[in-house]
Amino acid sequence: MGKPIVAIVGRPNVGKSTLFNKLAGKRISIVQDTPGVTRDRVYAEAEWLNYNFTMIDTGGIEPTNDDIIMKQMRRQANIAIETADVIVFIVDGKEGLTAADQEVANMLRKSKKPVVLVVNKIDSLKYEENSWEFYNLGIGDPITISASQALGLGDMLDRVVEHFDRFDADAEEDEYIRIAMIGKPNVGKSSLINKLLGEERLIVSDVAGTTRDAIDSYLETEQGKFILIDTAGLRRKSKVKEEIERYSVIRTYASIEKADVCILMIDAQDGVTEQDEKIIGYAHELNKAIIVLVNKWDLVEKDDKTMEKFKKDLQGSLKFMPYAEYLFISALTGQRTHKILELAKKCYNNYNKRVSTGILNDVISKAILMKEPPIVSLKRMKIYYATQVATKPPKFVFFVNDASASHFSYERYLENQLRNSFDFKGTGIQIEYRQRKE
């Protein structure tokens, strides 16, 4: 199961972006910021009280009249309801309760999702009583904060993480391999999922997933148990194109967060687009298992060298993830679709692989004998030993004399040695240096 997702919801100018940027400013143990496809800051990886989670800023276009504000608030609340596990609902303590606040509160109550009500702009104790009227929303006790002054944020996050304990109960789904199908509209994701579901006799059930538009399909095959996280419902007709694009990004990123294996489907006639690179780049940053699926291969004029040349071109465009697996298919005709789940299982096994410490250090010792670390700033890093500390993704910690003497080229060399020795094809891996005395 992926990390819990926390969405920040509220009408324009209540302080959503201020709060998000305060969190993303590394003032509360933020681990990593990830820009969205639209280059807006959509996601921030966060940690609080040893809980890791993902914050979403559901802000976007700020409407100019009341009718559009209400429509925007409904759409924003829907996005939060669809993608989030916990919702932070921000209201303006200085302006007071509004009709838009009431409408969103009604939607959030019906969602059955945990909601943390936050009254912002309470910059001093004299404004505390301003929060009382928000009890009328009927969604629990309000937490008062000042996002701009970073007051009350700890209490707010304490309330948020209280809802995370229920995620420990998701162990039943751990035996399923979670696959996110990602890619631009019209590339064939829906056709492929229907093909996979139609070919497999042992479908367990289709259940509503984390999004209303998408369906998470549970199925069992000879290869194993799978959950297909369908992002086919990303498209929605709207006059406000940029707004919907942003929400599509949020849905897609939420799918990546929850997945073990990310399958990027591209159109053989279009190749890799800039949007494809950014979306799969996020999966790469999270070190997910990755497959690039080239669809509509039946429409390409080809000879016996076309596929290899096409693959090399793709690898050139996606050179930041040389470990990715590639498969050329036709969702329409079924060409090679029977290989998809088999390849996904292989990538997942590598994503979940654990290496014994003894064998690992034998490999590292030989690697150092073949090529010792370079001198960096008059210092040479000495590696004492290494150990694997996690799976999904595989994470290796190297204990060294001086982590500041590390060099990216040598880290790449060590990664290649690990990949060559233990077959991590199809998955990202992590390497971390920890300093210790000899």
UniProtKB/Swiss-Prot annotation:
UniProt binding sites for GTP 2: 183-190, 230-234, 295-298
GO molecular function: GTP binding; ribosome binding
An annotated GO BP: ribosome biogenesis
Keyword GTP-binding assigned: yes
Matching PROSITE patterns: G_ENGA
NCBIfam families in UniProt: GTPase_EngA, small_GTP
HAMAP family listed in its UniProt record: GTPase_Der
Subunit field text: Associates with the 50S ribosomal subunit.
UniProt-listed PANTHER family: GTPASE DER (PTHR43834:SF6)
Protein's UniProt name: GTPase Der
Species annotation: Clostridium botulinum (strain Eklund 17B / Type B)
